[in-house]
Amino acid sequence: MSPPVFIDTHCHLDATEFDTDRSAVHSRTRAAGVALCVIPAVEVANFEAVRLLAHAQQDAYALGIHPLYTPQATEAHLAQLDAALHAHRHDPRLVAVGEIGLDGFVPELNTPEAWAKQQFFYKAQLKLAQRHQLPVIVHVRRSADGLLKGLRDTPVVGGIAHAFNGSLQQAQAFIALGFKLGFGGALTYDRALQLRRLATELPLSAIVLETDAPDIPPHWLYTTAEQRAAGEPQGRNEPAELPRIA
C-alpha cells in the first residue's frame, strides 16, 4: 500500500520565522509526504511574496486581507486585491481568496469602530470572491455566527473555515454552505476535549488538515509560559508535522 499523501491547507510559509531555513523546511515537508501547501496572504504587502513562493515551491496560494490587518487597510487595498485576482485569474496555483474573515478575540479589533471595519472588509472580500468565482479561506475566532451571516448574504463557491473551533451546529451550517472545516495542532492537546469530540461527530469528507505554520504548534512543540520566561523559544510549527497531527 502506498503511503498517504497530505495537503497542508493553511500555512504561512512566507513568515519571517522561516527566513533562515525555508528551503530545508520545504525539503522536510515533501519528505514527510506533504505534497502541497496552501499559502494564504494576510495583507496587500505580501501578495507578491506568497505568489512567488507558491510557484517556487510548486505549492498553491490565496490572496486576501486578514482581519488582524484591517486597522491599516484601505479601500485602495481592496482595489489592489481585485486587480491581483484579475491579473492572476488563469494561474492554477491561485486557489482562493484568503485569509479573510472576522476576529472576535483581539480586544482592539472589537471596539465598535474596529468591528465595523472588520465587517466592511469581510463583506467586500466576499463580493470579490463571488465576482472572481473563487472559494474563500476564512479566519474563525469567536466569530462563526457573523461569518455565516456574511456567507448567507453573499454566497460564494465554498471554502475552508480555518482553525475551526465552534459548535456542531455552526459546523453543520458551514458544511451546508459548501465549506470544509480546518483542523490542526489544537487537536493534539489532551485538554481539547470539545474539539476532539466535534471532530468525531463530523463526516471525514467535511474535514481538511492544516498546520497554520509557524503558529498553532502541536503539543510536542509547545513551550509553556514558564519555559518561555526562562528563555526557551516557542516551538515553531511547520508542514512536516502534518502527518503526526493527523
Residue map of PLM features:
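Mid-domain alpha/beta scaffold segments of enzyme catalytic cores
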Residues: 1-246
